[in-house]
Swiss-Prot record:
Record's subunit section: Component of the 19S regulatory particle (RP/PA700) base subcomplex of the 26S proteasome. The 26S proteasome is composed of a core protease (CP), known as the 20S proteasome, capped at one or both ends by the 19S regulatory particle (RP/PA700). The RP/PA700 complex is composed of at least 17 different subunits in two subcomplexes, the base and the lid, which form the portions proximal and distal to the 20S proteolytic core, respectively.
Residues where ATP binds: G202, P203, P204, G205, T206, G207, K208, T209
Name under which the protein is recorded: 26S proteasome regulatory subunit 8 homolog B
Key words of the record: ATP-binding, Cytoplasm, Isopeptide bond, Nucleotide-binding, Nucleus, Proteasome, Ubl conjugation
InterPro entries, per the entry: 26S_Proteasome_ATPase, AAA+_ATPase, AAA_lid_3, ATPase_AAA_core, ATPase_AAA_CS, NA-bd_OB-fold, P-loop_NTPase, Prot_ATP_ID_OB_2nd
Organism: Arabidopsis thaliana
Cross-link (Glycyl lysine isopeptide (Lys-Gly) (interchain with G-Cter in ubiquitin)) at residue(s): K406
GO molecular function: ATP binding; ATP hydrolysis activity
Gene: RPT6B
């Protein structure tokens, strides 16, 4: 039986053994390096989590600290004794002020060292300590939110160039409104008092409101517009309070113009009546308005414009000089004025050549400025209806017929009034 042969391996040399040892060490080093890198990534992730938690806790701590400070201040205010609320009447000296406290009366009080006396103007609301009556705090003005809504934030964009046929009225209103605001030194040099109020009266649609907006634009004043019907309130005393706060806001934003439209709704003549149907509240509102007109000085740069189409029913106490210093009438435009108004309202329209606006003005005898503007609008609507991009003479004639047709018997009584 033959023996199986076994292949003999060559003997391992020292060099080969060294290489094997180095290879095993390299593999072991790569494993350790990978392990340490993974461990390092894990530690970095933990460090980021801890930093995030630390920042979150610091933010919570800051928020809690601010709440604690706020609560401490609130607690301190609650622990302080209450104060009386008063109104400054007059500054008596360097550290004395005459204050009116309701319902107790008027007192001359000391001023705290922390109060700037230059801020203590008449009608300023202040707080007095209940033990020593020392003035220690200046309070903000209390104004009804409804009154704040009456203030027009944006300066009106109406100008004198947009008003036609009212050259004389523009001249008169410039003298009593614009000139005192821009050049008060002229009145001081002459030694005359500045006018306080102006009444604009005339039929509807003759440009009273438009002229008031133009005055506010050219004088760059705060324009406060209020309708007389807004001052007629349901509860007793509410209308009077709104009138007071209206003038307080006007003083704060001086120079300012208060424009009261439809003044006949609160300024009608008083009659003896015990019916209790709400007329007494309207009369209280008018009396407060008269008081405010008498109370503020003309040098405060507060001007009052009033507009109405029923001057015949206004109370004579409202119309007397010193309250209303000038009355400006706004009649319906004549033929030349109607032509000027038509040119103003049609200058941006795409008109065909040969349109005779003077002929249109002749046909609209007795029309107001609002009706003339309506004619231009209706003429454009007739052109739009026929898919044209220009307005013709026929469009204007049709517009005149349509607008003037509305002037029927229901308006005759008003026209007879203004003849």
């Amino acid at each position: 039986m033959a023996a199986v042969g076994v292949e003999a391996r060559p003997p391992v040399t020292a060099m080969e053994e060294t290489c094997n040892v180095k290879g095993a060490a390299a593999k072991q080093g790569e494993g350790l390096n990978k392990y340490y890198l993974q461990h390092l990534d894990e530690l970095q992730r933990l460090q980021r989590e801890k930093s995030y938690n630390l920042n979150r806790l610091e933010a919570q701590r800051n928020e809690l600290n601010s709440r604690v400070r706020m609560l401490r201040e609130e607690l301190q205010l609650l622990q302080e004794p209450g104060s009386y609320v008063g109104e400054v009447v007059k500054v008596m000296g360097k550290n004395k002020v005459l204050v009116k406290v309701h319902p107790e009366g008027k007192y001359v009080v000391d001023i705290d060292k922390s109060i700037d006396i230059t801020k203590l103007t008449p009608s300023t609301r202040v707080a007095l300590r209940n033990d020593s009556y020392v003035l220690h705090l200046v309070l903000p003005s209390k104004v009804d939110p409804l009154v704040n809504l009456m203030k027009v934030e944006k300066v009106p964009d109406s100008t004198y160039d947009m008003i036609g046929g009212l050259d004389q009225q523009i001249k008169e209103i410039k003298e009593v409104i614009e000139l005192p605001i821009k050049h008060p030194e002229l009145f001081e040099s002459l030694g005359i008092a500045q006018p306080k109020g102006v009444l604009l009266y005339g039929p509807p649609g003759t440009g009273k409101t438009l002229l008031a907006r133009a005055v506010a634009h050219h004088t760059d004043c705060t324009f406060i517009r209020v309708s007389g019907s807004e001052l007629v309130q349901k509860y007793i005393g509410e209308g009077s309070r709104m009138v007071r706060e209206l003038f307080v806001m006007a003083r704060e934003h001086a120079p300012s113009i208060i424009f009261m439209d439809e003044i006949d709704s609160i300024g009608s003549a008083r009659m003896e009546s015990g019916s209790g149907n709400g007329d007494s509240e309207v009369q209280r509102t008018m009396l407060e308005l008269l008081n405010q007109l008498d109370g503020f000085e003309a040098s405060n740069k507060i001007k009052v414009l009033m507009a109405t189409n029923r001057i015949d029913i206004l109370d004579q106490a409202l119309l007397r000089p010193g309250r209303i210093d000038r009355k400006i009438e706004f009649p319906n435009p004549n033929e030349e004025s109607r032509f000027d108004i038509l040119k103003i309202h049609s200058r941006k329209m795409n008109l065909m050549r040969g349109i005779d606006l003077k002929k249109i003005a002749e046909k609209m005898n007795g029309a107001s400025g609002a009706e003339l503007k309506a004619v231009c609008t209706e003429a454009g609507m007739f052109a739009l209806r026929e898919r044209r991009v220009h307005v013709t003479q026929e469009d204007f004639e049709m517009a005149v017929a349509k607008v003037m047709k509305k002037d029927t018997e229901k308006n005759m009584s008003l026209r007879k009034l203004w003849k």
